[in-house]
């Protein structure tokens, strides 16, 4: 697979929607993830990321402007032991509960499908990072409508064993802006992952569309020790 420039990919797409990046730092020592949210409506833009336990959740920046919390207030990141779960919706909780009951990542998502926000039918994108005894692997999933037809849910899971240093995968909800919004197509995209969390955070923050970006979360986890460093950038503050 050809590696793409994450900077160019984001700068040339005004509305990829919500996006997940998972990979490994170039020096091989850190498991890396990033999650961003964007918005076109006042309701979607009226959000911030806040820390909750070892993860984060979305919260209304101005509670008086919150019109419909159903698909925009959720926990995008939760940690279960040596697993970090990152998703674009409340399926974070579904995966957490499934893994806790010894189901696999894929099995946990069997009870879920794309979001019921027709005509967009926003895909549910998810990722899980697994660190154990100095080994690091991850998986990503997308649940989407069949080319906009809600009668059929397409389920794709991508597993990456022994993640390669300096490389990651990027998946997002929408192929591009549109009406209705077209779902992401194809495999998660191969991108570079730098060693420095500040550099990676700045790359993402500066590449996302200025009007539509809302919040960004970046985490670097030390594969040897499990300790982590987190950056949260909210447009509203």
Give names to the regions the model predicted.
Residues 1-237:
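Conserved short alpha-helical segments that host acidic/polar catalytic motifs at enzyme active sites
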């Amino acid at each position: 697979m050809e590696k793409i420039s994450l900077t160019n990919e984001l700068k040339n797409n005004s509305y990829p929607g919500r996006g997940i990046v998972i990979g490994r730092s170039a020096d091989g020592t850190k498991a890396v993830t990033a999650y961003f949210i964007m918005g076109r409506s006042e309701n979607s833009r009226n959000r911030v990321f806040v820390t909750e336990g070892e993860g984060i959740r979305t919260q209304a920046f101005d509670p008086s402007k919150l019109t419909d919390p159903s698909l925009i207030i959720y926990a995008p990141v939760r940690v279960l032991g040596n697993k970090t779960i990152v998703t674009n919706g409340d399926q974070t909780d579904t995966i957490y509960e499934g893994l806790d009951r010894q189901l696999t990542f894929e099995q946990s998502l069997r009870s879920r499908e794309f979001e019921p926000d027709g005509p967009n039918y926003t895909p549910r994108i998810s990722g899980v990072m697994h660190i154990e005894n100095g080994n690091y692997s991850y998986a990503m999933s997308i649940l989407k409508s069949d080319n906009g037809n809600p009668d059929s849910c397409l389920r794709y899971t991508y597993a990456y064993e022994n993640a390669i240093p300096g490389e990651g995968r990027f998946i997002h909800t929408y192929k591009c802006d549109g009406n209705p919004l077209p779902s992401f197509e194809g495999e998660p995209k191969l991108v570079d992952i730098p060693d420095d969390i500040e550099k990676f955070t700045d790359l993402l923050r500066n590449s996302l569309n200025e009007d539509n970006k809302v919040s960004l979360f970046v985490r670097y986890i030390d594969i040897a020790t499990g300790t982590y460093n987190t950056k949260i950038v909210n447009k509203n503050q």
